Amino acid sequence: MSETILLILALALVIDRVVGDPDWLWARVPHPVVFFGKAIGFFDARLNREDLEDSARKFRGVVAILLLLGISAWFGHLLHRLFAVLGPLGFLLEAVLVAVFLAQKSLADHVRRVAGGLRQGGLEGGRAAVSMIVGRDPKTLDEPAVCRAAIESLAENFSDGVVAPAFWYAVAGLPGLLAYKMLNTADSMIGHKSPKYLHFGWASARLDDLANLPAARLSILLISAGALIHRGASAAKDALTVALRDHGLHRSPNSGWPEAAMAGALDLQLAGPRIYGGVKVSEPMINGPGRAVATSEDIDAGIAVFYGACTVMAGFVLAIAMI
């Protein structure tokens, strides 16, 4: 965790906050995650054969993800060495690359569209917007459920789309960042429990849980800080209290932390029963004593807390770099 790495990260956080993921750019050139997906698909097509025993598919999945992580870390090392010889230009280029793998503005923009969709197009407008950021069946969602889904996505993706990549870059530079993004992409592609990926994707899912563990815990402190800025000391305290009390109510070992913190910050019930692909997932409500009916104004409040948390993180990174 060198001074240079932290300064690059601070600049990257500013770039991502201001620029985000411009559609005009990624409409012309492929996003780096596209290449991660192609690499994962290559190994999936060649190693994940249906005629193999479950144990063989699990072993091949372990080999595949270890190779993918090694390749991505090696490529990150090469890029860092290249940027290092370019002086100030390399410093800027590395910051831009790091910003590409952060999701502050793009996440807030997507979630804000849900509130806008509800206000401009009613329930159908909200359902259409939220379907772009969550996997649950939008037709089963009423307006409060649409709002809850948007806020849950905001909280969860703050952890694995902002805090986690920033954490792994701070700890291990470009090799750590690229390896994390490869792992995160693999988890989304092959880490689910469908018959095809239950065994082949086992290692990717477990490693992703492990890699996101530090960020999930850090995220509750940042969300609490964001709540302090925008909603006061009581909301900040509730964010921590609910996170520590209710994180285990979520089926994910990591997502429950930021979601519970956001639920406490907004005095709102989150999670609970929902439907994915026609299958009902029965879970208790996080922050049961909180308000039961979420509104588009709660989405706005969640975004304010989110941006407050991002600001605190950027300030903390810069402060550590300057010590």
From Swiss-Prot:
The keyword Transmembrane helix applies. It comes from Sinorhizobium sp. It is found in: Cell membrane. This is Cobalamin biosynthesis protein CobD. The chain crosses the membrane at residues 5-25, 59-79, 82-102, 158-178, 210-230, 303-323. It is a multi-pass membrane protein. The lineage of its organism: Bacteria, Pseudomonadati, Pseudomonadota, Alphaproteobacteria, Hyphomicrobiales. InterPro entries: Cobalamin_biosynth_CobD/CbiB. Disulfide bonds: none annotated. One of its GO terms (molecular function) is ABC-type vitamin B12 transporter activity. Belongs to the CobD/CbiB family. It comes from the Bacteria. One of its GO terms (biological process) is porphyrin-containing compound biosynthetic process. Pathway: Cofactor biosynthesis; adenosylcobalamin biosynthesis. Keywords: Cell membrane, Cobalamin biosynthesis, Membrane, Porphyrin biosynthesis, Transmembrane, Transmembrane helix. Converts cobyric acid to cobinamide by the addition of aminopropanol on the F carboxylic group. GO terms for cellular component: plasma membrane. Its main location: membrane. The keyword Ribosomal protein does not apply. It holds the Pfam family CobD_Cbib.
